[in-house]
């Protein structure tokens, strides 16, 4: 087992690991002390560890996206756990999922467990089903805290469905295209005309990163948000992503959308983007069903 960090949480984690019979418990530090048997992050990659537990604040809100260990180079990993609970999935957890690690879990459930057992202590009574209580509270918190992001082709109904769904779920509605316009002071066609698609995508990624790390939101995303890999990573760190799948013949041509100015352009765009949309885990068959 590898434990990242050398603070108080490391000490607790190490004690539990040894108590549960871990064959080896190795400590990883940015400034390793060889006399204490500590490893650098570079050395840790070749440790042969089966389990990694992060006890550092790396990747914690608001400094999301930080990851010190390259888990993709550790093929024997069976589990990665991160004590950080905000965002729901740190960069470490996202990378572990991408690397196919069987178990990759953030720290929210641990936070809830601490609260449940602290409540038992202070109230001087035991819950009838502490484990079940932890699971129920964790699920309720996750439903409340996580974002819902809607993706799909231009004019697929993301804004319309998004506003209705935000009201239903009690989440704040955010239209990322509107936020781009608000921040830049120009319309989307004007941004395209002045800076091209690359310029627009950079602004889109900046607004995605800004809002995706927050919580309790319904995010209506631009149709091309899936063209930048970092956008999907940002959306997944703190939410569920839904694809609104509207039939091609029901989509609107033009309407101030620079990349869908003709039927042929729309068909070509749909052919290019559909495989990217379908890579996601959650799909809504149609805006009406959503």
Feature names for model-found ranges:
Residues 282-287:
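Conserved small/polar residues in nucleotide/adenosyl-binding loops
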